[in-house]
C-alpha cells in the first residue's frame, strides 16, 4: 500500500469536465467565455447517416446527429444505440464535398452503464486504409478525433470494440466540424445556465473570499461507482486508483494536493473528524476488479482475502500516521465520526444476504477510534447505508427492508443512538418514490437533512433533496428538491416498479455525497465534479475530474461544532456483544401504552387480546442466482415467484418467519412484555380469536436490557418511540411471551398448518374428491405441497407465470397479479408496491380471507349446518399463517441451490414422456396438451390427475377419462410415466428438501 503521493501535475484541459475549473473559476466570468469563440459549423447535422444496427426506432442513428448533446442521465432516447453487439459502424454522407477537420464523439451518457465504444477506425471516401485509428476513454463528455484535411463526401467510423458492461453501445452525439474545435469551446458549450447567473457568480465569490468559513476542501479521488443496485457498492464497482486530496479553490483554478495515494486500491468515502485533524476512510486495497452487473461474478459470495474487502483506516489531515482499524474477510465501510470519539460504520461480517439477490448485506456497527470494541448496532436482515450524525447526536442512516412489501422501495431514513438503543424512523418508510434516500447529512443551521434521492436499481447517484420530517414522516411536503432539473419522482406507471430505476422509468441524476455548509449552501459531487450550490439551484463548479477519475465526498477542512454526546437509553451495559455480530440471546422489554391509539374507531376497545412477536429470519447462506441448466448447456436464472431463491412463498413473504410468542394485552390497551434483543422483530395485534387486526410492515430491534415504548398501534408509521430511562414506570415485571406449541423456530407450513387440514378437511378435499376444485392434502409438489398450492397460488399469476419477476405497477394492475379466492395475502413482487399504502385494519390476512370464515363457521352445508368443528388451537394456526403472509418454508437454507427457486423438484423428462404417451393413447379425446394441474405431486406421483384419471377404477384410479386408458398400474406407459420420478426420489433421499422432516439432519 502506498501513502506517499506524487506531486499533482497540472490538470489537462482535453475534455469538458477537466476544463471546468479554468472556465468557471474566474472571479468575473462573463455570460459567455469570449476566448472560446463561436463554434464552427457542425457538418454532421446536414449529413445522411446510417449505422450497422439500432436498438429500436427510439435509438436510431439520426438521433446522434441532432446537434444537441443529451444531458447526463436524462430519460432514455436522444442517442443512438446498437442492438446487443460490442462493435458496429456509423456512416455519414454528403451530396457535395465538405471540408471536415474534426469528429467529436460523446458516449451514451444517458445510460447508467456508460456504454462506450473503445477502439475505432475512421475511413474517408471509401479509401482502402483508415485515415485515423484510436481508442476512446470510457467517460462522459466530448472526445475529439482529428482528421486529415481533405474534401470528403463520406465518413465511416468503424467501432471495433466496446468497454465491458456496454451491452448496447452507441453515441449520445457525433459532431463533425469544419474547423478544429478547442477544448475551451467545447467546455463553454456545456456550461449549464444555472452557473452563469449573477447568483451563481456571487456564490463563487463567497467561496473565494473566504466568507463561507473555510479555505480548503477534503476530497476523495476515484473512478465513479457504476453499479447495478444501490446496495451493491461494497461488491461491485471497484476500479483502482485515486486517493485523498486537499483542494484549495483560488482565482486561477486552485491548488490540489494529494495527502494519501490509494495506489492499486480504491477509497469509497472519507469523513473528517470534528476538530478537523483526522480522517477515517474506507479503502479496498486490490483484488478482483468487479463492475456492473454482478451477474458476471455472482459465484463469489464474499472475498476470502482481506485485501479484496473494504477496510477502515485512520490518517492525519497531513497524511501522516496511517493506521488500519478493521481486518478480516469481510467488508467494513461508510465510516463516520461519532461525538464521543468513536466511529460508526457498516459491516457484512455477520452472514446475511439480500433475499432477492446474491450479495452480502452490511449493517450498522460502531467501534472506538483505535478500532477496539467493535459491536453491531443494527439488527437489519438486509442492508444499512451511509451513516452520519445528526445535530442531536443520533446516527442517521438508510435502511433497506421489505417486511411483507415489495423490495424496490423502500430505502428510508432511520435514526438510532450511538449505543444501538432508541431506534426510530426518520423519514420515508411509506414513500414509494423516490425509492431510496441516502447520504443523509444534517443541515447545521436548520431542521432536517440533505440527502440523495435515487433509485433502487442503478448507481447511488440522483437528485439532492432537503428533508424536514416535521411536515410528516412520509409527507411529500417534507421534501424539497434542490436539483429541480432532476425529476425525483420519475416513474412510468405500468412500466416498472416504483423506486426501481430501470432504464426507462428511473431518476436521472449525477449528484452524490452532499455536505451542508449552513446558510442554505452545500458542497456536492456531480458526476465527479465538485460543486458549490445553494438551495435555489444556483451552482458553481469548482473542480473537474482528472486522470479518468472524479472527486467525491467534499468536506470543508475546519473545526465543526460537536453534536450532543448521548448516553443512550436504559440497556444492560454488562452484556458482551461479540465483534463478529453474533446474537447474544439476551432479552429486552417493549411497553405499549395504549394499543388502540391509531386504530380507533375502526377497532373497538376490548377487541385486541394479544400481541404476536415475529422475527424476520435472515438469508444466512449464499445462493448463486445463475446456475447451470440441468437439461442442457448454458446458465439460467433460478429466481421464481418474484426474485426468490431460495423460495419461501408463492410471491408473498420473502423471508421466513419465527414466532417468538404472544403477549397479553390489558383491558386498557397496555402491555409490557419481553422480546429477544438484537434481532429484527415486528408485531401483530390479535383479536380474541387470534386474527391480526393490524400488522407492522416494518421492524424494530432492541439492545440487551433495553426498554422501548410506543404510544399505540400507529396507522401512519409502524415505528417505536423510544422511552428514556426514568420516564417509564411499569406496573409490574414485563411478562414472558407465551411460546407457540410448535416451538420457537422458523414457521413451517407443513409442520404447523398442514396437520389442521389433515385432521379436519382431507376426508372430503383430497386427490379423488375435490369439491370446489379444492384439494387440501399435504403431498409434496414441485415447489410446495398440494394444499399450499391450492390455497395460495390459485387465481394468481403464480399458477403459470411463476418465472415472472414482476408485474406492471399500481393497484390498477392487481388483476394481472391476481389474488387467491381463499386468502387475501400481500404480494411482494415488483409492481405491487402500492399495497404498502393500504393500511386499514383487517385489510389483509385472516380477517379479510374466505378461508378464515369457513373455519370460523364450520364450513356449513346447504342447510346452514356446520360440517366440521375445528378447535380453537387449530384455527389459530391457520389464522397466524395467513397473517404471517403465508410462508411455506421455515428456512432460507437449501440442499438444492441449483434448482429453480433452490427448491423445485420435477422430472426432467416428465413433460416429454407425457406428451409422447398422450400422442398415442389420448389423442381421441385430448387435442394438444393434456389437462394438468399447475402443480405436480412429487413423492406420491401416482396421485397426480394425469395418472389417476386414465387409470381404471378397478385398478385404483378415478377413471375420469371415461373408458380406461390404463387398465392397470402394470401398463407399460403408466410405469414409464411413474418411473420418471425415480431420480427425484433418489435425490430427495440423499438430500431432503427443506419441507421434509429429514431436512435438518442433512442440510449443508
Where are these regions (language model features)?
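Aromatic- and Gly/Pro-enriched helix-to-coil junctions and flexible linker segments
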Residues: 34, 180-214, 239, 600, ...
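Disordered, acidic Ser/Thr/Pro-rich linker "stalks" and the adjacent N-terminal cap
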Residues: 37-100, 108-120, 135-137, 147-149, ...
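Short beta-strand-plus-loop segments that form exposed binding edges in beta-rich domains
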Residues: 158-165
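Residue-level detector of Asp-centered blade-edge/turn motifs that repeat once per structural unit
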Residues: 212, 274-275, 338-340, 390-391, ...
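Short, conserved, GDST-rich strand-edge loop motifs in beta-rich repeat architectures
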Residues: 219-239, 282-308, 345-360, 397-411, ...
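Beta-propeller blade signature
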Residues: 243-248, 308-318, 360-370, 410-421, ...
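Multi-bladed beta-propeller domains
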Residues: 252-266, 317-331, 368-382, 417-436, ...
Amino acid at each position: 500500500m502506498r501513502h506517499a503521493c506524487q506531486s499533482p501535475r497540472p490538470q489537462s484541459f482535453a475534455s469538458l469536465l477537466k476544463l471546468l475549473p479554468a472556465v468557471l473559476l474566474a472571479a468575473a466570468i462573463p455570460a459567455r467565455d469570449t476566448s472560446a469563440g463561436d463554434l464552427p459549423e457542425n457538418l454532421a447535422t446536414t449529413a445522411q447517416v446510417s449505422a450497422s444496427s439500432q436498438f429500436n426506432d427510439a435509438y436510431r442513428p439520426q438521433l446522434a446527429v441532432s446537434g444537441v448533446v443529451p444531458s447526463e442521465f436524462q430519460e432514455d432516447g436522444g442517442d443512438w444505440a446498437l442492438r446487443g453487439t460490442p462493435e458496429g459502424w456509423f456512416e455519414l454522407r454528403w451530396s457535395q464535398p465538405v471540408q471536415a477537420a474534426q469528429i467529436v464523439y460523446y458516449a451514451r451518457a444517458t445510460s447508467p452503464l456508460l456504454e462506450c465504444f473503445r477502439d475505432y477506425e475512421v475511413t474517408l471516401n471509401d479509401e482502402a486504409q483508415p485515415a485515423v485509428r484510436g481508442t476512446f476513454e470510457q467517460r462522459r463528455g466530448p472526445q475529439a478525433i482529428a482528421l486529415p484535411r481533405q474534401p470528403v463526401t463520406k465518413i465511416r467510423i468503424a467501432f471495433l470494440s466496446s468497454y465491458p458492461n456496454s451491452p448496447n453501445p452507441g453515441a449520445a452525439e457525433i459532431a463533425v466540424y469544419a474547423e478544429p474545435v478547442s477544448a475551451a469551446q467545447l467546455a463553454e458549450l456545456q456550461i449549464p445556465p444555472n452557473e452563469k447567473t449573477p447568483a451563481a457568480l456571487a456564490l463563487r465569490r463567497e467561496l473565494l473570499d473566504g466568507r463561507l468559513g473555510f479555505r480548503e476542501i477534503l476530497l476523495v479521488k476515484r473512478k465513479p461507482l457504476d453499479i447495478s443496485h444501490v446496495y451493491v457498492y461494497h461488491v461491485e464497482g471497484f476500479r483502482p486508483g485515486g486517493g485523498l486530496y486537499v483542494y484549495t479553490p483560488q482565482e486561477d483554478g486552485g491548488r490540489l494536493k494529494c495527502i494519501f495515494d490509494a495506489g492499486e486500491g480504491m477509497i469509497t468515502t472519507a469523513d473528517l473528524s470534528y476538530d478537523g485533524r483526522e480522517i477515517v476512510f474506507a479503502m479496498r486495497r486490490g483484488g478482483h476488479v468487479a463492475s456492473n452487473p454482478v451477474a458476471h461474478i455472482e459465484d463469489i459470495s464474499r472475498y476470502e482475502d482481506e485485501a479484496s474487502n473494504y477496510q477502515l483506516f485512520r490518517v492525519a489531515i497531513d497524511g501522516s500516521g496511517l493506521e488500519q482499524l478493521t481486518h478480516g474477510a469481510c467488508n467494513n465501510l461508510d465510516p463516520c465520526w461519532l461525538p464521543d470519539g468513536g466511529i460508526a460504520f457498516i459491516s457484512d461480517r455477520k452472514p446475511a444476504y439480500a433475499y432477492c439477490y446474491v450479495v452480502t448485506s452490511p449493517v450498522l456497527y460502531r467501534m472506538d477510534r483505535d478500532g477496539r470494541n467493535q459491536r453491531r448496532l443494527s439488527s437489519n436482515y438486509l442492508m444499512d447505508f451511509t451513516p452520519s450524525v445528526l445535530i442531536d447526536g443520533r446516527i442517521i442512516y438508510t435502511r433497506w427492508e421489505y417486511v411483507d412489501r415489495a423490495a424496490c422501495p423502500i430505502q428510508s431514513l432511520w435514526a438510532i443512538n450511538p449505543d444501538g438503543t432508541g431506534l426510530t424512523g426518520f423519514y420515508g418508510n411509506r414513500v414509494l418514490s423516490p425509492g431510496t434516500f441516502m447520504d443523509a447529512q444534517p443541515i447545521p443551521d436548520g431542521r432536517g437533512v440533505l440527502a440523495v434521492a435515487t433509485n433502487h436499481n442503478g448507481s447511488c447517484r440522483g437528485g439532492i433533496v432537503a428533508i424536514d420530517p416535521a411536515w410528516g414522516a412520509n409527507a411529500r411536503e417534507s421534501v424539497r428538491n434542490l436539483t429541480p432539473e432532476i425529476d425525483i419522482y420519475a416513474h412510468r406507471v405500468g412500466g416498472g416498479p416504483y423506486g426501481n430505476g430501470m432504464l426507462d422509468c428511473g431518476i436521472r441524476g449525477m449528484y452524490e455525497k452532499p455536505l451542508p455548509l449552513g446558510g442554505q449552501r452545500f458542497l456536492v459531487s456531480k458526476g465527479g465534479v465538485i460543486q458549490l450550490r445553494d438551495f435555489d439551484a444556483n451552482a458553481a463548479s469548482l473542480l473537474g475530474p482528472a486522470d479518468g477519475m472524479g472527486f467525491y465526498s467534499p468536506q470543508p477542512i475546519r473545526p465543526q461544532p460537536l453534536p450532543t454526546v448521548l448516553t443512550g437509553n436504559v440497556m444492560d451495559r454488562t452484556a458482551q456483544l461479540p465483534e463478529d455480530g453474533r446474537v447474544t440471546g439476551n432479552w429486552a422489554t417493549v411497553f405499549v401504552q395504549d394499543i388502540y391509539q391509531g386504530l380507533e374507531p375502526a377497532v373497538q376497545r376490548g377487541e385486541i387480546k394479544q400481541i404476536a412477536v415475529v422475527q424476520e429470519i435472515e438469508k444466512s447462506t449464499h445462493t448463486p442466482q445463475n446456475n447451470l441448466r440441468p437439461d442442457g448447456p448454458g446458465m439460467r436464472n433460478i429466481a421464481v415467484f418474484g426474485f426468490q431463491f431460495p423460495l419461501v412463498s408463492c410471491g408473498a413473504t420473502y423471508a421466513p418467519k419465527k414466532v417468538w410468542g404472544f403477549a397479553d394485552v390489558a383491558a386498557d390497551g397496555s402491555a409490557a412484555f419481553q422480546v429477544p434483543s438484537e434481532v429484527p422483530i415486528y408485531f401483530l395485534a390479535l383479536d380474541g380469536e387470534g386474527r391480526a387486526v393490524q400488522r407492522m410492515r416494518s421492524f424494530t430491534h432492541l439492545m440487551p436490557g433495553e426498554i422501548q415504548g410506543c404510544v399505540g398501534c400507529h396507522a401512519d408509521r409502524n415505528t417505536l418511540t423510544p422511552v428514556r430511562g426514568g420516564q417509564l414506570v411499569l406496573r409490574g415485571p414485563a411478562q414472558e411471551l407465551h411460546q407457540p406449541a410448535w416451538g420457537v423456530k422458523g414457521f413451517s407450513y407443513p409442520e404447523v398448518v398442514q396437520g389442521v387440514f389433515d385432521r379436519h378437511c382431507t376426508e372430503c378435499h383430497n386427490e379423488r374428491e375435490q369439491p370446489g376444485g379444492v384439494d387440501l392434502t399435504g403431498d409434496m409438489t414441485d415447489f410446495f405441497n398440494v394444499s399450499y398450492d391450492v390455497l395460495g397460488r390459485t387465481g394468481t399469476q403464480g399458477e403459470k407465470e411463476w418465472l415472472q419477476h414482476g408485474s406492471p405497477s399500481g393497484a390498477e394492475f392487481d388483476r394481472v397479479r391476481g389474488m387467491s379466492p381463499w386468502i387475501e395475502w400481500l404480494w411482494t413482487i415488483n409492481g405491487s408496491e402500492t399495497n404498502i399504502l393500504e393500511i386499514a385494519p383487517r385489510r389483509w390476512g385472516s380477517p379479510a380471507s374466505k378461508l378464515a370464515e369457513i373455519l370460523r363457521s364450520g364450513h356449513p352445508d346447504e342447510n346452514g349446518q356446520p360440517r366440521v368443528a375445528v378447535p380453537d388451537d387449530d384455527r389459530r394456526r391457520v389464522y397466524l399463517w395467513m397473517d404471517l403472509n403465508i410462508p411455506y418454508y421455515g428456512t432460507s437454507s437449501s440442499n438444492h441451490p441449483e434448482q429453480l427457486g433452490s427448491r423445485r423438484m420435477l422430472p426432467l423428462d416428465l413433460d416429454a414422456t407425457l406428451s409422447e404417451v398422450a400422442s398415442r393413447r389420448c389423442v381421441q379425446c385430448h387435442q394438444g396438451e393434456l389437462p394438468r394441474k399447475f402443480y405436480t405431486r412429487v413423492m406420491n406421483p401416482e396421485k397426480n390427475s394425469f395418472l389417476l384419471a386414465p387409470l381404471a377404477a378397478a385398478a385404483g384410479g378415478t377413471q375420469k377419462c371415461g373408458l380406461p386408458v390404463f387398465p392397470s398400474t402394470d401398463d407399460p406407459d403408466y410405469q414409464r410415466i411413474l418411473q420418471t420420478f425415480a431420480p427425484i426420489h433418489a435425490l430427495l433421499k440423499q438430500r431432503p428438501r427443506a419441507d421434509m422432516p429429514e431436512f435438518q439432519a442433512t442440510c449443508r
